[in-house]
């Protein structure tokens, strides 16, 4: 009986040592990894950090982008002249999209009927933007 207890205790000790060695290895490897670069954005500005582009079966080009903004108090991320920017928060809260001047000069801005975004049109070309959260 005492031999069996010693054998089990010995196995438990080895398991504990193995787990501690595994943990130490992972912590050491994590410490050797270079730090992840953080993008600092100047207060009151926005920066595109990822952009995606594709076409659906109707030959309509779809684009999306991820933006990092550092806005002043009372401002939120928005769009001005087709570029990411900080805009007054009331524009976004009340969905008065065209007040942030999202279109390029010469384009006409119209809010979508369901207030989910806006469209910019010039001649026969129409660009529609839908806001997602």
UniProtKB/Swiss-Prot annotation:
InterPro entries: Chemokine-like_TAFA, TAFA_chemokine-like. One of its GO terms (biological process) is positive regulation of microglial cell activation. GO terms for molecular function: receptor ligand activity. Brain-specific. GO terms for cellular component: extracellular space. Residues 1-30 form the signal peptide. It comes from the Eukaryota. It is found in: Secreted. Belongs to the TAFA family. This is Chemokine-like protein TAFA-3. It comes from Homo sapiens. The gene is TAFA3.
């Amino acid at each position: 009986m005492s031999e069996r207890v010693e054998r089990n205790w010995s196995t438990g000790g080895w398991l504990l040592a193995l787990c501690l060695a595994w943990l130490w290895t992972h912590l050491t490897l994590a410490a050797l990894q270079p730090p992840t670069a953080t993008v600092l954005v100047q207060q009151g500005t926005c920066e595109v950090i990822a952009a995606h582009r594709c076409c659906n079966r109707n030959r309509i080009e779809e684009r999306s982008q991820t933006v990092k903004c550092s806005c002043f108090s009372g401002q939120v991320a928005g769009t001005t002249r087709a570029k990411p920017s900080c805009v007054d928060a009331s524009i976004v809260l009340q969905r008065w999209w065209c007040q942030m001047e999202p279109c390029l000069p010469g384009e006409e801005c119209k809010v979508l009927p369901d207030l989910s975004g806006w469209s910019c049109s010039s001649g026969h070309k129409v660009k529609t933007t839908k806001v997602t959260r």
